[in-house]
Amino acid sequence: MENHKSNNKENITIVDISRKINQLPEAERNLLENGSVYVGLNAALCGLIANSLFRRILNVTKARIAAGLPMAGIPFLTTDLTYRCFVSFPLNTGDLDCETCTITRSGLTGLVIGGLYPVFLAIPVNGGLAARYQSALLPHKGNILSYWIRTSKPVFRKMLFPILLQTMFSAYLGSEQYKLLIKALQLSEPGKEIH
């Protein structure tokens, strides 16, 4: 019985939060509800940049669309979903109530999933294309790891700025979403005005 009461209280809290979010102006509500899409679009851009850099290094000239679509689509979807699960949903349900925690979660999501993951994803995609079209001399079985580390170093150096930009943007977006949620929670309910 106690679990049922706790669950009912939790549902009331979620309903109250969503009702107050709906009172925000449309632009602010849009940022609060769809912020993960913006982070996902930045991750897709990071994926396309990493794909382009690896294609140049490995001299891959064929299958531009076949490599570009997954390098934009997969980082977008994973970053959008991860940001929604770790930042947006806990904020909207009241489980994430600390600004520092929100900034840390959103920044780490931007760094790991939105920045580093697309670069690591570009390695097998373009390595497979280089092997298929024989555009670059690939290593033998003994020195595969050292080859990919050596090949990836210039890409990671060039991707440093987009990765840092993605991290800072995600952290800033998390901070703004937290401030908007606090603003929404401080709004008075229509019809429940205090005199």
UniProtKB/Swiss-Prot annotation:
Subcellular location: Mitochondrion inner membrane
Consequence of changing S36L: In OPA7; likely pathogenic
Transmembrane residue ranges: 34-54, 57-77, 111-131, 159-175
Gene Ontology CC annotation, any one: plasma membrane
Biological process, per Gene Ontology: mitochondrial protein quality control; mitochondrial respiratory chain complex I assembly; optic nerve development; protein insertion into mitochondrial inner membrane from matrix; toll-like receptor 4 signaling pathway
Positions of disulphide bridges: none
Membrane topology annotation: Multi-pass membrane protein
Chief place where the protein resides: mitochondrion
Tissue: Strongly expressed in brain, cerebellum, skeletal muscle, testis. High expression also found in fetal brain, fetal retinal pigmentary epithelium, and fetal retina. Highly expressed in retinal ganglion cells.
Topological domain spans for side Mitochondrial intermembrane: 55-56, 132-158
Residue ranges annotated as Mitochondrial matrix topological domain: 1-33, 78-110, 176-195
Keyword annotations from UniProtKB, A to Z: Membrane, Mitochondrion, Mitochondrion inner membrane, Transmembrane, Transmembrane helix
Quaternary state and interactors: Interacts with OXA1L; promoting cotranslational quality control in mitochondria.
Protein family per UniProt: Belongs to the TMEM126 family.
Disease: Optic atrophy 7 with or without auditory neuropathy: A hereditary condition that features progressive visual loss in association with optic atrophy. Atrophy of the optic disk indicates a deficiency in the number of nerve fibers which arise in the retina and converge to form the optic disk, optic nerve, optic chiasm and optic tracts. OPA7 is an autosomal recessive juvenile-onset optic atrophy characterized by severe bilateral deficiency in visual acuity, optic disk pallor, and central scotoma. Some patients manifest hearing loss.
Functional description taken from the UniProt entry: Protein required for the cotranslational protein quality control in the inner membrane of the mitochondria. Associates with newly synthesized polypeptides and may act as a chaperone that cooperates with OXA1L for the insertion of newly synthesized mitochondrial proteins into the inner membrane. Required for the assembly of the ND4 module of mitochondrial complex I.
Protein name as catalogued: Transmembrane protein 126A
Lineage: Eukaryota, Metazoa, Chordata, Craniata, Vertebrata
